[in-house]
């Protein structure tokens, strides 16, 4: 029996309040309005950004259905939708691509003005929600809310992908892999023969390592306080791995001594102010580029001496690795299908969706890189 045009009742993980476990609830998902798409989710990854919301580091309206790194199949479409149809395999896009705003028209940027990151409303682009639970509206997250068996997204926030692609793997292209890999190849523009330092070896950090290797870096120094992550980092391309706790001097000084004054490219992939500064300081004062990849704590500021930049350093950041989402995600999936890169090393655990809280426990313990939840 077709569900098109009808309210769907399904299971979703609702975050009712900060620093509490997710609650598996029955929610009602309204049909898509014009220019919207309803998706049946198949696989979703647990990303550190979701955990930043739970901890209060990243602010979004609650109660909400989180999740933003996923893949699924189109269930139905609203009026006027032309880029996807029911049955298509798709990846929802946490950063949309409307194609019309000044940012979408700028070849150097991907931070579409339709995003729900800068000033999160917790709704779709028309300002309303498609979710209700216990008779109350539930907020969306980044416009896609993938911790639900069904979700509704705007058409400019979904990309059709290869019909043969394995959704349990390519879901990582929705955030973690693209964010890390693109930070190296698009944002920093790592050059052949260069020296790189990567702070933080979670799924995104390891994807940065992969990007640095693909770009031809000669040295890739991986930095983490969890030495259990070093073997995987070396497998993916790190040439050296160091633990700041093994030294009695600041890690930026260690890195500068190792690299004749500083690395060419550094990446902070944790989301801490102290490591953002260490990452900046470890890149060469005359020619180094440091990229902020990790989501910083809300409402906290860094203070720094502008002389650090005057001498020639570049300090920059980007979301989703600088990729224009709707056009680049399908290309990345095609590259994966062509075996240009593998995602297997990033996936350490696969759990049923109902065990979402166990997946977050694995993240907190440092035992997982990426946990995939299957619906």
Curated annotation (Swiss-Prot):
Residue ranges the record marks as coiled coil: none
Q: How is the cofactor bound?
A: Binds 2 Zn(2+) ions per subunit.
Report residues binding Zn(2+) 1: 47, 68, 175
Q: What class of enzyme is it?
A: oxidoreductase
The biological process GO terms on file are:
alcohol metabolic process; retinoic acid metabolic process; retinol metabolic process
Its localization reads: Cytoplasm
- Record's Gene Ontology CC terms? cytosol
What protein name is recorded for this chain? Alcohol dehydrogenase 1A
* Encoding gene per record: ADH1A
């Amino acid at each position: 029996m077709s569900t098109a045009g009808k309210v769907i009742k399904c299971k979703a993980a609702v975050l009712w309040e900060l620093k509490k476990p997710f609650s598996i609830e029955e929610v009602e998902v309204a049909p898509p309005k014009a220019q919207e798409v309803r998706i049946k989710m198949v696989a979703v990854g647990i990303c550190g950004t979701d955990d930043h919301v739970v901890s209060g580091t990243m602010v979004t309206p609650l109660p909400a259905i989180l999740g933003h790194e996923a893949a699924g199949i189109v269930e139905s479409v609203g009026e006027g939708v032309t880029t996807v149809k029911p049955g298509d395999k798709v990846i929802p896009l946490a950063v949309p691509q409307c194609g019309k705003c000044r940012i979408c028209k700028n070849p150097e940027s991907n931070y579409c003005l339709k995003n729900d990151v800068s000033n999160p409303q917790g709704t779709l682009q028309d300002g309303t929600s498609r979710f209700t639970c216990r008779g109350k509206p539930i907020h969306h997250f980044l416009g896609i809310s993938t911790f639900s068996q069904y979700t509704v997204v705007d058409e400019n926030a979904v990309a059709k992908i290869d019909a043969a692609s394995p959704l349990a793997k390519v879901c990582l292209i929705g955030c973690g892999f693209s964010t890390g890999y693109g930070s190296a190849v698009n944002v920093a523009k790592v050059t052949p023969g260069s020296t790189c330092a990567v702070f933080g070896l979670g799924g995104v950090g390891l994807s940065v390592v992969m990007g640095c290797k693909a770009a031809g870096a000669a040295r890739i120094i991986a930095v983490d306080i969890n030495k259990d992550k070093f073997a995987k980092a070396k497998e993916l391309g790190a040439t050296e791995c160091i633990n700041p706790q093994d030294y009695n001097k600041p890690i930026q000084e260690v890195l500068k001594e190792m690299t004749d004054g500083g690395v060419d490219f550094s990446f902070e992939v944790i989301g801490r102010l102290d490591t953002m500064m260490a990452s900046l300081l470890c890149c060469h004062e005359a020619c180094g580029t440091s990229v902020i990849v990790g989501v910083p704590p809300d409402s906290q500021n860094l203070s720094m001496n502008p002389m650090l930049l005057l001498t020639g350093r570049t300090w920059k950041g980007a979301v989703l690795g600088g990729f224009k989402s709707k056009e680049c995600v399908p290309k990345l999936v095609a590259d994966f299908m062509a075996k240009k890169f593998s995602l297997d090393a990033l996936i350490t655990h696969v759990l049923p969706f109902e065990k979402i809280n166990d997946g977050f426990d694995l993240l907190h313990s440092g035992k997982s890189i990426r946990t995939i939840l299957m619906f």
